[in-house]
């Protein structure tokens, strides 16, 4: 497709994803803080009947001819690898928080094209905050434009992430301000996109569904989100799992990456 057609198609898809994750949020809220069946899967990872209900809703609403599908709660059949474009979904990102009745969980959907996100939606149902982005169109929260914070200073920067990584950062600059951990990883990185925090780390073993939507939101908000060697993340690979990650406004990201690179072993 010509670039302008592609952009308008992505913008239309962003609106569609926005409606879908909002509706999915209403499904999740019906179960929230009420009696709910939950169990564990894999490495002690919680899953609930709400995760499954939201997953089924999003799959029915979004999946279509010509697009692959990858979701935390769907069986990965790997036919997605033959698709240039696919939906990547996390029905409830932050299930532990959701089951504990906390507010830091979200519903996440992205469209990835040739390994990079081109459309993103992150919805925080408790606060009714909808974050949307389409490639080249900027990023919004509830319709208003958002941007990462400017500047490159580490001193006074509000940073979220795993405790261990933040403690290592303190040894470099004790003036950094550690934000409370945001359990939904997509929401943690999206807080960087909207400038509510200045930077965020993710430890190793985050998955495509945790990262793809937030990646686009951060970039469209004027920031950068990469692995700790500064490379862009590639999605829809055979194994959809990533190493440690840093997100921040562009200048701060470059400065922090420089510091982290010099101490790579401490942060990996």
How does the language model describe each region?
Residues 1-92, 265-268:
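N-terminal subdomain of lithium-sensitive/metallo-dependent phosphomonoesterases centered on the IMPase/IPPase/PAP
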Residues 28, 51, 62, 95, ...:
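Residue-level signal for inorganic ion chemistry
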Residues 65, 83-84, 115-118, 154-156, ...:
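Short coil/turn connectors at secondary-structure junctions
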Residues 71-73, 143, 229:
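Short loop/edge segments at beta-strand edges and connector loops
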């Amino acid at each position: 497709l010509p670039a302008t057609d592609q952009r308008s198609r992505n913008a239309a898809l962003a609106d569609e994803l926005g409606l879908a994750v909002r509706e999915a949020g209403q499904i999740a809220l019906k179960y929230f803080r009420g009696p709910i069946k939950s169990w564990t899967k894999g490495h002690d990872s919680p899953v609930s009947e709400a995760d499954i209900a939201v997953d089924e809703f999003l799959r029915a609403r979004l999946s279509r001819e010509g697009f692959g599908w990858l979701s935390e709660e769907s069986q990965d059949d790997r036919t997605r690898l033959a698709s240039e474009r696919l939906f990547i979904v996390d029905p409830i990102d932050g299930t532990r928080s959701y089951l504990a009745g906390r507010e830091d969980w979200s519903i996440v959907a992205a469209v990835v094209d040739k390994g990079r996100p081109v459309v993103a939606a992150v919805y925080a149902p408790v606060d009714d905050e909808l974050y949307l982005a389409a490639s080249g169109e900027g990023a919004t929260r509830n319709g208003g434009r958002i941007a990462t914070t400017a500047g490159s200073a580490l001193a006074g920067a509000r940073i979220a992430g795993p405790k261990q990584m933040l403690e290592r950062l303190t040894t470099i600059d004790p003036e950094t301000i550690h934000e409370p951990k945001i359990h939904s990883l997509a929401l943690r990185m999206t807080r960087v996109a909207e400038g509510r925090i200045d930077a965020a780390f993710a430890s190793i073993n985050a998955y495509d569904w945790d990262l793809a939507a937030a990646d686009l939101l951060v970039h469209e908000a004027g920031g950068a989100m990469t692995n700790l060697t500064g490379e862009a993340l590639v999605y829809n690979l055979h194994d959809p799992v990533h190493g440690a990650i840093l997100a921040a406004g562009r200048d701060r990201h470059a400065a922090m990456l420089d510091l982290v690179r010099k101490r790579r072993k401490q942060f990996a």
